[in-house]
Design a protein with these regions (language model features):
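Condensing-enzyme catalytic core mediating Claisen C-C bond formation in acyl metabolism
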Residues: 1-24, 207-263, 267, 271-275, ...
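N-terminal extracellular/periplasmic Venus flytrap/periplasmic-binding protein-like
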Residues: 11, 23, 28-31, 164-245, ...
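Active-site pocket-lining segment
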Residues: 249-318
């Protein structure tokens, strides 16, 4: 089997719903990243482009992205939909193809535009009726709030308090603001004139968060104060058989009860650590996609001694969660955390709608 390395990668600044990328189609965001990677790695012959996307217009939007870029039309492209875990799935397929010797160099990641998410309509003969923005994730539910309800169930199961949830939101924004001020993430963000990570808030407080009403009624916990908003962005990485700065050691994929989908980030992490025979104390930088604050609470419940190495630059509560590319953003952030920390091992994990989860372990080469 072939060792798989990450040569590098980039993401766009992440835009809020209907803000800086309100009218920009996601394939153009993706093409901008592909063009930057082509300039950065001009000698790499690309065998495939694998693109995650969750709420786009359908078709093979990854191929459209490739055709809009400076890469040759002879480079194939595939689109993957695993909802929140789409980019992680794309990276996983790229990892597997290179490891099996089927490809040598693959660009993988994802694109998303919540701002341009189309309204879909069920066919006349479908037993489901009407129009929808949110797809059906499990056989027994067509609820558009399925992910919110999942976060609420996990919050209740682990007896999380509202104060805990607020504290994690505040931590995420504070870390992200510090990273912004120090330029810690600048090496992995494509410079786009007039664009920035729009979600970061420097002036928020628990008092302000407490004014935001819960989504599922007065006795519930989940609200916009402890959930990520909807966003636009793109992120891709170049995976290769050639030695690079980071090696992908292994990955894990899991599935479980869709009603408790946030838990799958923990289960994916646990499976991966068992596969590689490591404990969390061996990991120098950890990224979980914090679509909800309860995911941070899960980390603290299971790994209380490792919180200081968790989401070093803040997470999706601050930056946002452009579903189809979040997994690639997580991997880029953990790579940058390893550079800053001068660490060896990095782990990132993400849960997805429908009760799925994916995790990756990477190693900084030469450490």
């Amino acid at each position: 089997m072939v060792d798989v390395y990450i040569q590098g990668g980039l993401r766009t600044p992440i835009g809020l719903f209907q803000k800086q990328y309100a009218s920009m189609r996601p394939e153009y965001l993706g093409a901008a990243i592909l063009n930057a990677l082509k300039k950065r790695y001009p000698e790499s012959h690309i065998d495939d482009i694998i693109c995650g996307n969750a709420v786009g217009t359908g078709g093979n939007i990854g191929r459209l992205t490739g055709l809009l870029s400076d890469y040759s039309e002879a480079v194939p492209a595939t689109t993957i939909d695993m909802q929140c875990a789409s980019a992680s799935a794309a990276l996983g397929f790229a990892f597997a193809k290179i490891k099996a010797g089927l490809s040598e160099n693959i660009i993988a990641g994802g694109i998303e535009s919540s701002s341009l998410q189309p309204l879909r309509t069920y066919a006349d003969k479908d037993d489901r009726t009407g129009s929808y923005y949110v797809a059906q994730f499990s056989p027994d539910s067509t609820d558009s709030l399925a992910m919110i309800r999942g976060a609420e169930r996990v919050s209740q199961k682990y007896q999380v308090t509202q104060k805990e949830l607020y504290q994690w939101t505040l931590k995420s924004h504070a870390k992200a603001q510090k990273a912004l001020e120090t330029g810690a993430l600048s090496p992995i963000i494509l410079e786009m004139p007039g664009k920035k990570d729009e979600g970061i808030r420097s002036k928020i407080s628990e008092k302000l968060l407490s004014r935001i009403p819960p989504i599922l009624g007065p006795d519930s916990l989940t609200s916009a104060a402890n959930s990520c908003l909807t966003h636009d962005g793109a992120a891709f990485l170049l995976l290769s058989h050639q030695v690079g700065e980071f090696k992908i050691c292994d990955m894990a994929q899991v599935a479980g009860d869709p009603r408790f989908s946030p838990e799958l980030v923990y289960k994916a992490t646990l499976k991966l650590l068992k596969k590689v025979n490591l404990s969390m104390s061996d990991i120098d930088a950890i990224e979980w996609n914090e679509a909800f604050s309860v995911i941070d609470c899960l980390f603290q419940r299971y790994f209380p001694e490792d919180v200081n190495r968790y989401n070093l630059f803040g997470g999706a509560l601050a930056y946002g969660h452009p579903y189809g590319c979040s997994g690639a953003i997580n991997l880029l952030h953990v790579m940058q955390a390893l550079r800053v920390q001068k660490g060896r091992y990095g782990l990132c994990a993400i849960a997805g709608a429908g009760g799925v989860g994916i995790s990756f372990l990477i190693e900084r080469v030469g450490v």
